[in-house]
């Protein structure tokens, strides 16, 4: 498919399982040294961005009680950049999607604090005006994760239903019960325990959720979202990464904020000049 050699070549059954179920766990992707290095970098950036927020979980909004969310860390922390642009991960994403090239759509830290509530079941891709572009998330844990401390559950085959009704996971309005959608055919979520060094992948249309964190420690997870390089903007509604690059409806993705990460470049990409809010979903507010 490409003249570049994948740093990590996936087995055919791994790819087949992903395309059948819409999610797959891949073991032993990152070694202990890499994990320690990247976890320290992400921890430091999350701490820097949230240093002024001293609220307890109970004092936060319903959405914020699900997790501390810090997005596009690669843009503001050079030590996180090698993880967000990791050629091994990007190559795996391309193989799973069956495309020659992928861009970095976003990264984010999702740190579910002790006592943090469950994350409501939803699809990712319906949040963004990109239609049905091939899109995949890498869910990278820095700690062992079970249903006790914030594991993910995925509805097998739900990606084949395509875009369903968008779920308001901010809970500013009543969240749609997507698990009862008839297009899911009654399929139930499957909980996935995961150890550090493994990565769980899910399609942009896979319905997924996370359990509450009943442990005494913060559940630390970093995600990287990849999108096919030739994807286009389909609708005009506000979307931070597309608005920042002034991408019009019908135009292909471009710009320093969405760099091509597979095939890899010799050097890590330079971050954009304008970056988003320090925490939360980063919609249209920008700061220099």
Could you tell me what each predicted segment is?
Residues 52, 199, 205-288:
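Non-heme Fe(II)/2-oxoglutarate
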Residues 106-108, 123, 140-144, 156, ...:
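Short, structured patches in soluble enzyme cores that scaffold and shape functional sites
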Residues 126, 135, 209-213:
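Glycine-rich phosphate/pyrophosphate-binding beta-alpha loops
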Residues 145-209, 231:
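Double-stranded beta-helix
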Residues 100-107, 117-119, 134-140, 150, ...:
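Generic beta-strand structural signal
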Residues 1-21, 26-121, 127-129, 167, ...:
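Non-heme Fe(II)-dependent double-stranded beta-helix
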């Amino acid at each position: 498919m490409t003249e570049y050699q994948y740093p990590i070549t996936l087995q055919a059954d791994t790819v087949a399982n992903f395309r059948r179920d819409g999610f797959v766990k891949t073991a032993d992707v990152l070694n202990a040294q890499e994990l320690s290095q990247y976890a320290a970098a992400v921890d430091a950036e999350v701490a820097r961005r949230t240093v002024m927020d001293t609220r307890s979980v109970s004092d936060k909004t319903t959405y914020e009680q699900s997790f501390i969310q810090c997005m596009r860390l690669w843009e503001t922390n050079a030590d996180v950049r090698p993880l967000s642009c990791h050629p091994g991960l990007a190559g795996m994403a391309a193989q799973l999607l069956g495309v020659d090239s992928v861009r970095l759509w976003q990264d984010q830290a999702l740190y579910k604090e002790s006592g943090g509530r469950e994350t409501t079941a939803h699809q990712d891709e319906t949040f963004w005006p990109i239609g049905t572009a091939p899109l995949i998330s890498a869910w990278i844990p820095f700690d062992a994760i079970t249903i006790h401390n914030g594991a993910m559950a995925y509805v097998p085959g739900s990606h084949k239903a395509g875009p369903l009704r968008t779920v308001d996971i901010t809970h500013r309005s009543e969240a749609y019960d997507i698990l009862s959608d008839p297009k899911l055919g009654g399929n139930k979520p499957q909980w996935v325990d995961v150890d550090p060094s493994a990565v769980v992948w899910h399609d942009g249309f896979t319905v997924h959720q996370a359990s509450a964190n009943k442990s005494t420690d913060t559940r630390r997870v970093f995600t990287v979202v990849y999108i096919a390089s030739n994807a286009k903007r389909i609708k005009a509604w506000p979307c931070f990464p597309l608005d920042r690059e002034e991408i019009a409806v019908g135009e292909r993705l471009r710009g320093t904020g969405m760099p091509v990460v597979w095939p890899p470049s010799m050097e890590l990409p330079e971050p954009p000049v304008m970056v988003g809010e320090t925490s939360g979903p980063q919609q249209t507010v920008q700061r220099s």
